Amino acid sequence: ERPVMIMADRLRLEQVIINLVRNALDAMKGSDTRELDILLTVGDSAVLAVRDTGAGIENLETLFEPFYTTKKPGDGVGLGLAISSGIITDLGGRLSARNGVDGGAVFEIVLPMLENRDVEAAE
């Protein structure tokens, strides 16, 4: 198979993925079932989905607003998703969230595929 090629700053993309995974792990702390799925699908765009079995998302409308948090004071200031959304937007993509069909949350990063595949991939 061919590698999935996107134009992105590797460190900034890693920051977003780490933030989504940490949020998913935090969301599942009180769950009896703890499953975290990271799925990559490719079509016209590259789509990376982070899916958890936590309680789901109550306030989808304000989720990406700066300083919005569901965490206890001292556990987070509510900037992670706002920053992550900004990073993905800067890369020409979008970050979205929804509740999973069977519960939990699903976050999707959609990024355009690199058209010129003659470029070397970052390690």
Can you say where each PLM-predicted feature lies in the sequence?
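Conserved catalytic submotifs in the C-terminal HATPase_c
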Residues: 1-4, 43
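Conserved micro-motifs of the catalytic ATP-binding
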Residues: 5-8, 70
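Short alpha-helical Gxxx[C/S/T] motif in the catalytic ATP-binding
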Residues: 80-84
